[in-house]
C-alpha cells in the first residue's frame, strides 16, 4: 500500500438519533463530536436510521413515503 493516501481507520461510536441507541464500529468517517462509551472517548457519528430503528429489523412497519404517481392515479379515478 502507498503511504499517506489512505484515510485513517479507527473505532467510532454511531448513535441512532431516533432511538438514542449507540454502538461501536470501525470507520474512516471524521467527526468533531466525541462521546464516552464503555469508559473510552470516541468520535461520535449521528445516523438517522440504524438496525435499532429500521422497520425491517424491528418488525414494525411504518409508511413514510408520500403519495406517489400510482396513489394519485388511484385517488383520481377512485380505484382504491
From Swiss-Prot:
The keyword Ribosomal protein applies. The keyword ATP-binding does not apply. Part of the 50S ribosomal subunit. PANTHER family: 50S RIBOSOMAL PROTEIN L31, CHLOROPLASTIC, LARGE RIBOSOMAL SUBUNIT PROTEIN BL31C. InterPro entries: Ribosomal_bL28/bL31-like_sf, Ribosomal_bL31, Ribosomal_bL31_B, Ribosomal_bL31_sf. One of its GO terms (biological process) is translation. This is Large ribosomal subunit protein bL31B. One of its GO terms (molecular function) is structural constituent of ribosome. Keywords: Ribonucleoprotein, Ribosomal protein. Belongs to the bacterial ribosomal protein bL31 family. Type B subfamily. Gene3D superfamilies: Ribosomal protein L31. It comes from the Bacteria. GO terms for cellular component: ribonucleoprotein complex; ribosome.
Amino acid at each position: 500500500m502507498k503511504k499517506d493516501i489512505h484515510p485513517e481507520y479507527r473505532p467510532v461510536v454511531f448513535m441512532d438519533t431516533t432511538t438514542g441507541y449507540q454502538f461501536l464500529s470501525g470507520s474512516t468517517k471524521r467527526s468533531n463530536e466525541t462521546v464516552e462509551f464503555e469508559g473510552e472517548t470516541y468520535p461520535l457519528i449521528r445516523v438517522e436510521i440504524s438496525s435499532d430503528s429500521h422497520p425491517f429489523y424491528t418488525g414494525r412497519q411504518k409508511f413514510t413515503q408520500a403519495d406517489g404517481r400510482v396513489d394519485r392515479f388511484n385517488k383520481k379515478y377512485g380505484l382504491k
